[in-house]
């Protein structure tokens, strides 16, 4: 090993604040695994109540499908009339704010955490995600840390948002690029 090699054994996570104490974090782990994510639990009201009990701020009319993962509900804000599709993953080591009338499709990944690869111990490098009203995050997409998805923007199936997305923009690819404007009819 040379002086400039990666040394994961020196990673300690000290630059990361979970936003909740150890007991709350452990309790959420079990509640999430046994009740919230469980395929036997089709009851959205129970899931929403548990998210709120653990600190999530959720508006009215949330539709939440099975196997949705929320790592830290205390770092989650969701507006009114939103959809969280089956198997979407909200990896919110930092704050995730979702506006109203937002669709997060099945298998989408909202990723607020990463590592600083320029430092040998690879400490966390986290940043919040903001998804504004009317946006649609397509199936099997990834929204990277620090991204703002502006009002009514669309991230198409399988795409990766590595930069902010303009209002009414439709984005596609890896990295996602704007391919056209979204026009909404009444």
Language-model regions, residue ranges each:
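Flexible, glycine/small-residue-enriched loop-and-beta-strand segment within the central core
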Residues: 38-48, 68-78, 83-148, 174-175, ...
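Beta-rich strand-turn-strand
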Residues: 139-163
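Short, functionally important structural connectors and interaction interfaces within domains
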Residues: 50, 60-62, 70, 121, ...
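Terminal amphipathic alpha-helical/low-complexity segments used for targeting or macromolecular assembly
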Residues: 1-56, 60, 134, 152, ...
């Amino acid at each position: 090993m040379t002086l400039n090699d990666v040394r994961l054994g020196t990673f300690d996570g000290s630059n990361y604040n979970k936003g909740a104490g150890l007991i709350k974090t452990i309790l959420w782990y079990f509640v999430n695994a046994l009740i919230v994510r469980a395929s036997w639990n089709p009851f959205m009201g129970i899931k929403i109540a548990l998210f709120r009990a653990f600190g999530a701020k959720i508006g009215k009319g949330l539709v939440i499908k099975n196997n949705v993962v929320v790592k830290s509900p205390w770092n989650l804000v969701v507006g009114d009339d939103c959809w969280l599709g089956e198997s979407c993953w909200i990896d919110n080591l930092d704050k995730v704010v979702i506006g109203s009338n937002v669709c997060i499709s099945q298998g989408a990944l909202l990723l607020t955490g990463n590592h600083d690869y320029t430092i040998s111990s690879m400490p966390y490098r986290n940043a919040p995600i903001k998804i504004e009203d009317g946006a649609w995050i397509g199936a099997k997409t990834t929204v990277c840390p620090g991204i703002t998805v502006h009002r009514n923007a669309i991230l198409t199936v399988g795409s990766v948002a590595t930069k902010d997305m303009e209002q009414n923009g439709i984005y596609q690819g890896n990295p996602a690029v704007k391919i056209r404007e979204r026009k909404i009819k009444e």
